[in-house]
A protein has these predicted regions:
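Gly/Pro-rich turn-and-neighbor structural signature
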Residues: 262, 266-269
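Dynamic "connector" segments at or just before major functional cores
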Residues: 1-229, 235-250
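Acidic/histidine-rich, metal-coordinating catalytic segments
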Residues: 183, 252-262
Length: 269
């Protein structure tokens, strides 16, 4: 975990700039008076990809925001962007956002007009531009109850369809043939996570997610428990995937490919 950008350091730092060997006609200088720093410059690239795909804006339409909009800070797309960009940067755990909420570069990537959080309405939140772990946890665990702690219910079926359509629209409309690859990959766990099961094939505890690709394009990623075989739940997934591909590529021949774990009559029928 990196040190929060606002954290003070007891180390005596050099204040004078350091000069390095010139790079052609350019001078290379190290200056320690740069102000707010971040080690996550890749967040800006993630934002550009998000803008091109319209990911967070589209996903935001799968949620219902019951919060009082007059007092809302941050907005729903900003919450989604913070969580998704954090995952893309390698911060999988929500408690990572205890420090990430202080990162001005991540705040700028999440479209915050005040990346330092100096103008926030609540004085207790000033200097903290982004949300903490508890807010993001409520977003992830939101349900269909409009209670004090659950103000952002989501529609799982709508999210599923949204992500599928985003993948399918990358396929060429006039494709002659579309090869759909099925894969089940063991995801081992190292604790007592909810839903973990022992899988004899992997000789360990974990999950058995289902992945569906067309070439390098991901169409489906479904978390499943490991107490079933690779083919479990594939038929309902394929029905949705094939229908979406058929709507996009009307003249294409669709082939479904998988290893022996998917050699089941219900899939081949």
């Amino acid at each position: 975990m990196k040190t929060p950008p606002t954290a003070a350091s007891n180390t005596d730092c050099k204040e004078t700039p350091l000069l390095f060997e010139d790079l052609g006609s350019r001078k290379v200088v190290v200056d320690f008076s740069g102000g707010s720093l971040s080690s996550d410059g890749g967040a800006l690239l993630l934002r550009q990809v998000d803008v091109n795909l319209g990911l967070t804006q589209t996903l935001a339409q799968c949620f219902t925001d019951h919060r009082q909009q007059t007092f809302v800070d941050p907005a729903l797309p900003e919450l989604l962007a913070q969580r998704i960009y954090g995952l893309g940067l390698g911060y999988e755990d929500l408690n990572d956002h205890h420090d990430l909420r202080l990162d001005p570069l991540l705040a700028a990537a999440c479209n915050k007009s005040d990346p330092l959080g100096e103008d926030r309405f609540n004085p207790a939140h000033r200097g903290i531009a982004l949300s903490g772990a508890s807010t993001l946890n409520r977003l992830e665990l939101s349900n269909n109850r409009n209670s004090r702690c659950h103000k952002l219910p989501h529609d799982p079926a709508k999210i599923e369809g949204c992500l599928l359509q985003m993948g399918v629209r990358c396929l060429p409309k006039h494709a002659v043939e579309v090869v759909v690859d099925l894969d089940a990959m063991g995801h081992l766990v190292h604790g007592t996570q909810e839903g973990r099961h022992f899988n004899a094939y992997y000789d360990d505890y974990g999950y058995l997610p289902l992945y569906v690709f067309v070439g390098a394009i991901p169409l489906w990623a479904q978390l499943r428990t490991a107490d079933h075989g690779a083919a479990h739940g594939v038929v309902p997934a394929l029905e949705k995937i094939v229908a979406a591909i058929r709507k996009r590529c009307r003249q294409a021949r669709i082939l479904v490919r998988g290893d022996s774990g998917f050699g089941r009559e219900e899939i081949m029928a």
